[in-house]
């Protein structure tokens, strides 16, 4: 098995993205240069994981470190052309990691800021298969009709113009879709020694298929085990709300992230934040309970950080919040409730 490369360096905050391949080498630490530490890690199909859980870390990160890494697409990069089929795929979404965050303990919060995400290749893939997708007959959601047949679409990516092209199978129609790279999967190890499939979204994050996991945003995750054990994968070039047929434009990604540990700050569910908004995530079934989780978490956040009473926050959210259906095809639904910071009082110090 090929040993992945890890490079640890102390560097300034402006870094080039990883190339498609990284030379094999042992960890290297350069001391004495002012600035943030940079950790580079290159993943291959031989060292990805398929569950969120306790596993040997591929690298250690400190609070404030920047990470440059890559992820495979949801199919393990094996679907490349018309003769390929879904039975070639090894398993669920392959994950890069885990990354051990030094000093992280249960009850802390891990903050991940997305600095740069780039599609790593010339095409993306979309597909559906019998029994998968929100409108496809399955054992647990039977419909009046047979399951839909397997189909695969390939999306040429134009990096210069920042678009991917949809080409219909059954006609000559095609249209360009703007790229919006994001991680479909990003999460930490769950509690209690549990190993959770990479296809499952839950309170540890996971397969949230959240377009919010993109450049300019910060994701907050609850720390459940020592070291947090951060995983990521399932890169998307673009996705419609709900990921209704079960896939986005699935792509490998190259990523630059920054991690930060918030000691003693406990949260129950994932959250996102950017310069303009705060966003709380609800992940469960049925859909109305996912909505309740998202809204109660948003209200709790406003109460804790912005000083409004819970009842005032409840009233304000009812008048000014928005919701986004990120995911409706996996074992849990994913809802994001957000509010613009212009509607909030100054943040408490």
Report the location of each language-model feature.
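Bacterial N-terminal signal peptides
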Residues: 8-17
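Boundary at the C-terminal end of the N-terminal hydrophobic targeting segment
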Residues: 21-25
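N-terminal, Lys/Arg-enriched amphipathic/low-complexity engagement segments
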Residues: 27-87
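Short, structured beta-strand/loop micro-motifs enriched in basic residues and often containing a Trp
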Residues: 41-52, 88-95, 196-204, 298
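Short, Lys/Arg- and Gly-enriched loop/turn segments at beta-strand edges
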Residues: 74-86, 117-128, 227-237, 326-329
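Intrinsically disordered, low-complexity linker/loop segments enriched in Gly/Pro
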Residues: 116-211
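Conserved mixed alpha/beta catalytic, RNA-binding, or beta-rich assembly cores of soluble enzyme
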Residues: 179-288, 299
């Amino acid at each position: 098995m090929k040993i992945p490369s890890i490079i640890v360096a102390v560097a300034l905050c402006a870094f080039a993205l990883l190339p498609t391949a990284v030379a094999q080498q042992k960890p290297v630490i350069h001391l004495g240069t002012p600035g943030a530490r940079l950790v580079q890690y290159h993943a291959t199909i031989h060292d990805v994981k398929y569950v969120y859980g306790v596993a040997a870390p591929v690298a250690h990160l400190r609070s404030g470190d920047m990470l440059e890494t890559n992820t495979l697409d949801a199919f393990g990069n094996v679907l490349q052309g018309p003769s390929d089929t879904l039975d070639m795929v090894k398993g669920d979404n392959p994950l890069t990691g885990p990354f051990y965050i030094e000093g992280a303990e249960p009850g802390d919060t891990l903050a991940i800021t997305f600095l740069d995400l780039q599609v790593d290749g010339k095409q993306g893939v979309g597909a559906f298969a019998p029994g998968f997708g929100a409108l496809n007959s399955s054992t647990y959601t039977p419909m009046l009709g047979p399951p839909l047949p397997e189909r695969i679409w390939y999306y040429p990516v134009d990096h210069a113009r920042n678009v991917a092209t949809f080409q219909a199978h059954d006609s000559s129609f095609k249209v360009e879709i703007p790229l919006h790279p994001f991680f479909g999967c990003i999460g930490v190890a769950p509690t209690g020694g549990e190993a959770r499939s990479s296809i499952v979204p839950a309170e540890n994050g996971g397969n949230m298929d959240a377009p919010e996991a993109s450049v300019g945003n910060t994701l907050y995750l609850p720390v459940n085990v020592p070291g947090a054990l951060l995983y990521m994968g399932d890169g998307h070039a673009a996705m419609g709300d709900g990921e209704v047929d079960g896939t986005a434009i699935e792509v490998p990604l190259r990523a630059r992230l920054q991690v930060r540990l918030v000691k003693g700050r406990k949260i129950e569910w994932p959250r996102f934040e950017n310069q303009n908004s705060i966003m709380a995530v609800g992940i469960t079934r049925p859909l109305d309970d996912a909505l309740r989780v998202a809204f109660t978490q948003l209200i709790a956040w406003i109460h804790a950080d912005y000083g409004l009473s819970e009842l005032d926050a409840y009233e304000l959210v009812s008048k000014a919040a928005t919701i986004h259906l990120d995911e409706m095809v996996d074992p849990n639904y994913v809802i994001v409730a957000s509010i613009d910071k212009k509607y909030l009082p100054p943040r408490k110090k």
